[in-house]
UniProtKB/Swiss-Prot annotation:
Belongs to the phosphohexose mutase family. Keywords: Isomerase, Magnesium, Metal-binding, Phosphoprotein. Mg(2+) binds at S91, D229, D231, D233. The gene is glmM. Catalyzes the conversion of glucosamine-6-phosphate to glucosamine-1-phosphate. GO terms for biological process: carbohydrate metabolic process. Binds 1 Mg(2+) ion per subunit. This is Probable phosphoglucosamine mutase. The active site is at S91.
C-alpha cells in the first residue's frame, strides 16, 4: 500500500484522503509514539482530518497537543518538544486537496523507512487501542506561533523596509505580517486573512499567480514583495521593480549569504540551474532527487550549510530541517536592507533554459529510461538519482519521466547554444522511445 509521496500523504479530500485513513494513521502513529503535536492549515477539510487523527492518536494512548491553525514550519519547530509532529496540509495544492505530513523532533520529515513502516502497519492493521484509563490526553499549545517568532527574531536583524506581503489566504497570515512588523518593517498585506477556499489566487506562489503582488509592489513604492503558499513552507519574492524573482535566483542569493566565506556544502535538486554552481563558486554543490524531503535528507547526511528547491522551499539546518518560509522571509528582508533585490539579481549569471516533453506510456517508462541512459552516457558525466542528468562542457540536460502524465520531460540549460543541446537530447530521446 503506497500512501506517501514526496510531500507526505496528499490527495482529494473524501476520495483519496478520508477521515477513515486519518484515523488509521493516528492509530499507527499513536501505537509507536507517546507524545505528538498537531497543527493544520486553513483549508476547509483540515479540521475534519485533524479530529480523525487526534481520535486515532489518543485511542492508541498517545498524548496530543493541538497547536491550532499554524504554518508547517511553525508546527515542525514545535515538534522539538514532542516525539513527533503531525501537520494537516496540502501545501500549495488547491482547496479540494488535503494531506498529512509527519515530522521528527529535529524538523526532518519522516523518511522513507518511517513512511514504509506506517504504510505496512496500516495495511496489516498493526496498531493497538488502549483501555479507557490509558487513553491519551489532549492539550493545547497557545504559544507555538510566539515561540517560532521569538526564535527567528533572535537570529535576524531589524530593518525599516516597506514590504508588500501576499499570504495567499494561507496559514502564513497567522505569523509573517506580525513577525515582519516586529522586525521594524512597514507592512502592506494582500490576501492575509486565512480562508480555506483560497479565493484570491491559487496557493502556489509562482510568477503566474502573483500578478497582483507585482503590481502592488510598484504601486506602493515598496522595497520588496513576499508571497507564501497555503502552509508557508514556501516563500517567493518580487523585487522593487515588480519583477518576479525565480527560485534559482533566490536559491543562489540565500546560498551566498549562508555560506559567506566558509564555502561549505549546498544541497539542491537535480533540476537546479547552473547559475547556482557558478555564483557559489568554491562551495560544494550536491544534487538530490526532486522534493524538499530529499534535499533535507541530503543536508543532514552531508552536514551542509544550506539547501533548497527552486519551487520555493528554503532549508536552513541551523534552525530546522523543515523548509521555513517564515524565516526565509525575515532573512530576505535582512539581506535586501543592505542591497536592493534588483541589484543582487543583476550580479547573477543568467543562462538559457529550454524545456519540452514527449509522449511515453507509463508502463513503458522504465524500459525507456534504460535505453535512454545507455545512449546519453557517452555524452558526459551522468547522475541518475532522479531521471538522467548529463553534465556537458557547456551545460546540462535532464531526461525525466513525468510523475503525473504519460510523458517524458526534457530540460536543457546552457551557457550558450541551448537550442543545440536541447535538439541533441531530443533526438536521443526519440530514438530511445522507438
Amino acid at each position: 500500500m503506497k500512501l506517501f509521496g514526496s510531500s507526505g500523504i496528499r490527495g482529494i479530500v473524501n476520495t483519496e484522503v478520508t477521515p477513515e485513513l486519518a484515523l488509521k494513521v493516528g492509530l499507527v502513529l499513536g501505537s509507536r509514539k507517546k507524545t505528538a503535536v498537531i497543527g493544520r492549515d486553513p483549508r476547509v477539510s483540515a479540521p475534519m482530518i485533524e479530529h480523525a487523527l487526534v481520535a486515532g492518536l489518543t485511542a492508541a494512548g498517545c498524548d496530543v497537543t493541538k497547536a491550532g491553525m499554524v504554518t508547517t514550519p511553525t508546527l515542525a519547530y514545535a515538534a522539538r518538544k514532542y516525539e513527533c509532529g503531525v501537520m494537516v496540509t496540502a501545501s500549495h495544492n488547491p482547496s479540494e486537496y488535503v494531506g498529512i505530513k509527519l515530522w521528527n523532533p529535529d524538523g526532518m520529515a519522516f523518511d522513507s523507512a518511517q513512511q514504509e513502516e506506517i504504510e505496512e502497519a496500516i495495511e496489516k492493521e498493526n496498531f493497538s487501542r488502549v483501555t479507557w484509563d490509558l487513553i491519551g490526553k489532549i492539550a493545547e499549545d497557545e504559544n507555538a506561533i510566539r515561540d517560532h517568532m521569538d526564535m527567528i527574531e533572535g537570529l535576524v536583524g531589524k530593518s525599516k523596509l516597506r514590504v508588500v506581503l501576499d499570504c495567499g489566504c494561507g496559514a502564513g497570515s497567522t505569523i509573517t505580517p506580525y513577525l515582519l512588523q516586529e522586525l521594524g518593517c512597514e507592512i502592506i498585506t494582500l490576501n492575509s486573512q486565512p480562508d480555506g477556499h483560497f479565493p484570491a489566487r491559487n496557493p502556489e506562489p509562482n510568477d503566474q499567480n502573483l500578478s497582483l503582488l507585482k503590481k502592488a509592489v510598484v504601486a506602493f513604492g515598496a522595497d520588496l514583495g513576499i508571497a507564501h503558499d497555503g502552509d508557508a513552507d514556501r516563500m517567493m519574492a518580487v523585487d522593487e521593480k515588480g519583477n518576479f524573482v525565480s527560485g534559482d535566483e533566490l536559491l543562489a542569493i540565500f546560498g551566498r549569504f549562508e555560506c559567506g566565506d566558509k564555502k561549505g556544502s549546498v544541497v539542491v535538486p537535480v533540476d537546479t540551474s547552473l547559475m547556482v554552481d557558478d555564483y557559489l563558486e568554491g562551495s560544494e554543490i550536491i544534487r538530490t532527487r526532486v522534493g524538499d524531503v530529499y534535499v533535507a535528507e541530503g543536508i543532514k547526511q552531508c552536514k551542509a550549510i544550506y539547501g533548497g528547491e527552486p519551487s520555493g522551499s528554503w532549508i536552513f539546518p541551523k534552525i530546522s530541517y523543515c523548509p521555513d518560509g517564515i524565516y526565509a522571509a525575515a532573512k530576505l528582508v535582512e539581506i535586501v536592507n543592505e542591497k536592493k533585490l534588483s541589484e543582487l539579481r543583476a550580479e547573477l549569471p543568467i543562462y538559457a533554459t529550454k524545456r519540452g516533453a514527449l509522449p511515453c506510456a507509463n508502463e513503458k517508462k522504465a524500459e525507456f529510461m534504460k535505453r535512454a541512459k545507455s545512449k546519453l552516457e557517452p555524452l558526459g558525466k551522468v547522475l541518475d538519482i532522479d531521471g538522467i542528468r548529463v553534465e556537458l562542457e557547456n551545460g546540462w540536460v535532464l531526461v525525466r519521466p513525468s510523475g503525473t502524465e504519460a510523458k517524458v520531460r526534457i530540460t536543457a540549460e546552457a551557457r550558450e547554444n541551448v537550442d543545440g543541446i536541447y535538439e541533441m537530447a531530443e533526438k536521443i530521446v526519440k530514438e530511445a522511445l522507438k
